[in-house]
Amino acid sequence: MSSALKVFRVVLKERYKSPTLELIVPAMIAGNVMIPAFLIRGGFQPYGLVLSFIPMINVSETAAIALALRNVIFVTGEHVYQGFVSSYLTMPVSRTSFFLMAMVSDVVIPLFTFLAIETVYLDLAGILNPYSSSMLVIFSAGYLFSTGVIYLTTFLLKSPGASVLTSIFLLSAIFVGGGVGEFGLIISKNLNFLPLISWTNPYVIAVAETLLPSRYFGALADALTLGVLIDLILGALLYVITLLNFRRMDL
Amino acid sequence: MTAISLKDVRKSFGRYQALKGVSFNVQEGSVTGFVGPNGAGKTTTIKVMAGLVRPDSGEVRLLGRDPFEDVEVMNEVSFVFTRLMYPPTDTVLEYLEDQAAVFGGDVKKAIEEFDLKVHLKKKLSELSSGLAQRVQLAAALLKSPKLIIADEPAANLDPPARNELYERIKELNRKGVTFLISSHVLSELERVIDRVVFISDGRVTFEGPLGEALDRGEEIYLLVDNVEKALSVLSGRDVRKDGAYLVVRVDMAEAISSLEKAGVRVLIARRSSLDEAFKKYTNLGG
């Protein structure tokens, strides 16, 4: 086994000690309770499915984000603030490799766990369709953007409390403010600016698209696609900035 | 062969220049003391060697390799810090197993050798300073390192724990392990090191064998039973009082002989210690 893989095993173990997954996996499975609830109330309409994937309503998504938040701020962040990262960086691993290992453990594994559980759940329920698949893609893009914000604030602020408050405030402001803006644009039928802010809260557009698909003739779907792309690009940028910062950080 | 080589290493933190061109070598097989007052740049230098602080300029080589470019060198170099830098909720056993998972080594043997069996389930946060240092040293040796760099390893230890640490260092050095040890507990460091590097204000002020550092100036320290009489016997020579000691620039045998002829008992006679050399090379002598 290569040195990097050996270090990765240690990094992974630190984040997923028992009972982390024993708590999170059942919570993610049980957190899908809103999917059948909305589908029944919505008479199995697509918008019922879309609504059930809005963060906060969907407990599984909230659990995935909570796990990532804990990993980033209270494991990786804490290791940096307290100097424990010294022990890992005096192992035979470069800073870039260590950062990627931490990122995969902190962020990618919770996302993949969520996606795996959702895919199996939706498939078994017979509702793994373009709507639910699209919602998984929308969530994944937003998740990568949000965790990118959390990573950057964690490495810049070097304080767990300040990182939690700042990232939650920033993300909430973007999500709520963007959602209100999108709602205003949609109901006033002013769709020219919608693609520009679609990344802030794609769920408003997704709900509108599934409620009244014929009214907008695909304009909302285009804005939605653009929003997902912007989220992915911004997320990648935030990770690159954090990595560059970490590479030259004095520890 | 050179185990550590630093050439003109410079590092600033904002406006503060911590290292102003640090250069020194550590010979393979030696136990080298890295000595300087607080804020002299010892920890920054060690962090540079550990790859934790990137220097602004200069060259760093551990066992002939650049720790920033060739991270595999960490398989042969161990670092021991003042406090154990590992997640404090991990137990001693988890810590040792993690280290063994990366570097290899026999955890059972380390547990036996360092007498850690009864402490295995303790969290790292629950360990006393002495025990934490013992655990850290046990972990550092799992990889069978060629070089151990220790930053103030005795800083928080009581005298018995310090003695134990230094005995282990001597034993490991006999087996061929090279050491660079930063410390401010100089009287005890003197017992274990054979070379010394003095650093002051971000610059190396002396580098060489311990004997050479101590011999410079040829001062000797005498503890006598009658200070006034001794002062009159040694009058006309370069003599001064330093605490209970008389410090005199003279041949030791000649001084003892003339004092004893005058009926002054010499209780202790010694050359300058690392403490005196420390004052001299770090501009703290006043």
In which residue ranges do the predicted regions lie?
Chain B
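Short, charged/small-residue-rich alpha-helical element at the C-terminal edge
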Residues: 218-286
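Alpha-helix C-terminal capping segments
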Residues: 67-68, 74, 96-104, 109-116, ...
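Extreme N-terminal starter segment of soluble prokaryotic enzymes
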Residues: 2-3
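ABC transporter nucleotide-binding domains
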Residues: 11-181, 186-187, 191-192
